[in-house]
Amino acid sequence: MNWHNLSTILAVLTSLLALIVCGQEDNLGLKNGYISLSTANWDLKLVKDAQVLASLTPKGKSFDFLPFDYLSVRTENQQYHNGDITFSYRATGETEWVKVDSAKSRKAVTVVQAKDALAAADLMPTLPANSPLRIIRKWVDVDGDLGMSFTATNTADHDVEIGSLGFPTEFNSIFTNRSPEEMSAKCSLTDPYIGMDAGYLQVTPTSGTGEALIVTPMDNTSTPFEAWHNLHEPYFDSTAYESQTFEGFYEWLVHSTAYAGTEWRKAKPWNPPTSRILEAGQSTTVGLRFSVVKDGIRGIQKAVRATNTPLTIGTGYVVPRDLTVQLRILAPADIVSVTQTVHYFITESAPDAVARLGQFSTSTMWFTDTSDPFGRAPSIMSYDASTKKPVLQDPRVWIAGLSDEGGVIYMATAMKQSAHPDTNEIAKLEEFVSKVLFPTIQNGSDLVRKSIFFYEPSTVPGYSHSKSIDWGNWWSWNKADSYSTQRSYDYIHVVATYWALYRAGRDQPGLLKQRTWQWYLSRAVNTTIACFATDSAGRELVQYSRVGQMGETVVGELLHDLRREGWSKEADAVEVSMKKRADLWNSQAEPFGSEMAWDSTGQEGVYYWSNYFKLTSTATKTINSILGYMPTVSHWGWNGNARRYWDFIYAGKLQRIERMIHHYGSSLNAIPLLTQFRQQPKDTYLLRVGYGGVSGPLTNIRQDGSMYNAFHSFPDTLVGDDYSGDYGPNFLGVMLASATYVVDDPDLGLVAYGGNLAVDGQVVTVQPRDAVRQRIYISSMGVYIVVSSGWIDQCSFARANAKQVTLQLVPGPSKATSAIVWVENPGSSTQYKVTSQAKAMRGGWQVQLANVGVEVTVASA
């Protein structure tokens, strides 16, 4: 279903909303109206009966961070709102926890008069009668912001242990029955920093523009952000809770011991679980503060500091063992004692992790049964870490069918060769291409099949489909559906594989044995042209080819290489196809279409070609869109984590709607952010988010070299998925975007993201420590240097007024004998070139790499 048809359908569905939900109960009490309140920064409404937050808009503005327009279909018991509370308690000495939930069986709360509050209520009517905890909730003005506090008093004659204490959150992330334009205009997205006393939520408009919102602990309370707990609600068609159009809501947990010992007992939590003892008659107050971020998304970190919440800023939170990172702690001077957690993930050196991926995928994941009736041998198959075997059957046939994002783990191995070629791995990839990819996945043509595994037993006599699998779902395609060539996303996987082998063979002659580099380059071109072809009326011949593709930056790399090789006819053909799409996007209000109602995948391609053709307005719109769903926080899992929550359904072993940590959205969306940063080197927010996105997916490579689809974020799991799943496109982003960035950061000073930096007098020396080690950007000069093979061992330049860079290039593990050095100046009007001895070639300068390396100088022209 294409984006524009979907818009029309959703608009029609919206008009039918009242008919769909006519049977829903008004347990919330909307019939009795609202209480309208305001502070210096907010206009807000409370539901009169429940005194939960119904609407929250910046003062004098119309943008509502809450789904007030959907409140009439969110009135049932167990539908959560800001102002609800959940907790578990037990008498000291007891073992069983008693769960309490203010949304479970709603009753009108009792109004409490409080001079220090905008509104206050006793929640006892809506809590179980036998609860020993009396809860008073207050809505208060906190320096113009909105505060929400709960005071719990132990009314029992014995001590009570509070084992969990949670604040459900509700913001307007409901996409159901909205058009793309409405989603952008009305919706917002929530991301957590689970950092204990320094924890906070950031709520950002989907458009990425306008004011944002942060939620922080209230001053003078002990309200740590200990855990982020997904909430279950009843399902109604009107909102479709926990679906592709409505991820669902979460709660901020102050304490989590009760969960840690029960539902979460198999998981390792982000923070040590705690509880709180209330003696008989004792009270405790906890609370949250809702603050407007008037400077928008880029002002979030500054706004957090303004609430007296400690803040940390670092050069990344995924740390290879050979990399030194920086962390700055920004806290109020009068702070007494707080506990903050900064979450790091320590890996082997990035190239070592990449090498393990290549070794594992071409051994343990290598499938050689040539009797396979589907023609899948030899190939690199999807992998299940729980069984330690390739996935040869799955009802989602593409996972076992070497196509779709969930079945193309071979693309990760291929992309690895583009930077770190290995003779044995390339030999197996060439065998795969000649025996499976070209003759079967492509059927010897330029088209690409949706899957080469299928469920149609009559066509494969003698093959035994597993009887333990349910083959009755839509995704168990028959042969005709599997062999369809009508999914454009599948073409990019094939293009990337051909391109990667071209680059490996082009830069290191002798690596390719079965085909020439020219053959691989030609195959990449032909597959690209087939993917984006149109009829005489301009209509797509392959479905979805008009929208942005996952990983299509590789098409841009292909185009550059065609120009460098002098293949002008082929380059012109690719460019014409891309220009048509870019012009279309430039005419659309929301050009980020996909197979889904809302997605975070089209932005990469939309940005690439809008930026390429200098369609600045659309490129800027795209960057804003990405920042709307991609945060930077001091947590390896959430820093640079692009919002995705449905692909465990399509490519995971554990299938559920769940926020995914470092799925392919992270690395692919990092590409536009880092590209834009190179053009605007003073906008370091882009670098912080983008670097988090490109480094995060390194955590998906296990120590044995196997890979996982994404990390499960629900607190009852917190592990990587067993399936390799969609990691192929994810690793493509890692290979295309990894680089070292040297920047004078306003908060950190002169630092290197992805490298080790040292200053000796006026000389700065940087040693790259990223996954590729072939790209470095120096923001003070605005120069971006890329080498085609080998490694950049180190570079040096003057601390002030630098006019040249000296690089030390080495052969690297692939033992490269020569390299092309390409020099770009995206962040400067100054032109740079290689001034040391070199030969002009392929749009750059070729240098010979001796065994000990070679020194190359890049200076202003």
Predicted regions and their residues:
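Acidic-aromatic substrate-binding/catalytic surfaces of carbohydrate-active enzymes
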Residues: 24-127, 136, 177, 181-255
